[in-house]
Amino acid sequence: MSVSGLKAELKFLASIFDKNHERFRIVSWKLDELHCQFLVPQQGSPHSLPPPLTLHCNITESYPSSSPIWFVDSEDPNLTSVLERLEDTKNNNLLRQQLKWLICELCSLYNLPKHLDVEMLDQPLPTGQNGTTEEVTSEEEEEEEEMAEDIEDLDHYEMKEEEPISGKKSEDEGIEKENLAILEKIRKTQRQDHLNGAVSGSVQASDRLMKELRDIYRSQSYKTGIYSVELINDSLYDWHVKLQKVDPDSPLHSDLQILKEKEGIEYILLNFSFKDNFPFDPPFVRVVLPVLSGGYVLGGGALCMELLTKQGWSSAYSIESVIMQINATLVKGKARVQFGANKNQYNLARAQQSYNSIVQIHEKNGWYTPPKEDG
């Protein structure tokens, strides 16, 4: 689809579901992203509204050949199920039809009547006064030509004048040049793999992981060195994460200082591996080094954390929030470095075995949820 065609479609959607719509609102949009809200009346009080349900949509570079990717800021399994069914619905990749299906499903989920405005999504895109499609300015034509020459730059593309919220920052703003170069390298590699018929992963997972990586590169926690991220063999699905700063008052912090003096290592190295169905399944996370005791670290380096299981995972979780939660959990669980321990005891096969065993136990007996004051 051309840039002007995509813009016309997004404008059409935003004109129907504007920021004041009673049921579904498109709060902001760009050529590769939609931020939406679904409003659910409070039970027994139609005039009292709980916080709206927030949905995000990533529009891929190959749209409409490939489907947009939807995810939701909620841990409700019913909502996750709705999005999974949408992912399985391959009949129509057009945003208009996906939006219609999604709104109808959400209305059904919350026992609400189907909103009449969804029928407007079946209409063709509006035409100009002379019966032609909206006129494209020479400036837009020039932009479209640039897009055709270098389509992988779509992630950088921004039309500030079309955005409902003025002053919206570019998705690459706040990212250092060396990290932008990494993102660009990934995009070019993915494009080349696609041309060579050697695509790895899924469009859904790759788009979400690119978004996660951009958010990390932009975050203050990353920039201040609390943690770092490195892609293993340039793979978007295999990360090394270094926890470089932990609570300075913790025994773990003291151990890391000693480890630095002895071995020149002052961090905890984690491995994050992602599957094709991310973000609907959690990443598999394990400690690579150093060998730790306590801190909910299992044999092989796996982590005993509910949020890293299907039972406790939500597609709305960001990877940075997972990293920071692991950091806090290690400290809270009184993790200590095992100096002189056999480093070979941490490996992927053993970690997966420990993880599977602990998941089976907790599926039968449940998980312990600490009081809120314990974090």
Swiss-Prot record:
Active-site residue numbers: C304
A GO term for molecular function: ATP binding
EC number(s) reported in the record: 2.3.2.23
Composition skew (Basic and acidic residues), residue ranges: 154-174
Q: Where is the composition biased (Acidic residues)?
A: 136-153
Listed under GO biological process in this entry are:
protein K48-linked ubiquitination
Q: Matching InterPro entries, A to Z?
A: RWD_dom, Ub_conjugating_enzyme, UBQ-conjugat_E2_core, UBQ-conjugating_enzyme/RWD
Processing and modification events after translation:
Auto-ubiquitinated in vitro.
Q: What is its main location?
A: cytoplasm
The record's similarity note reads: Belongs to the ubiquitin-conjugating enzyme family.
Task: Report the protein's function.
Answer: Accepts ubiquitin from the E1 complex and catalyzes its covalent attachment to other proteins. In vitro catalyzes 'Lys-48'-linked polyubiquitination.
Q: What is this protein called?
A: Ubiquitin-conjugating enzyme E2 Q2
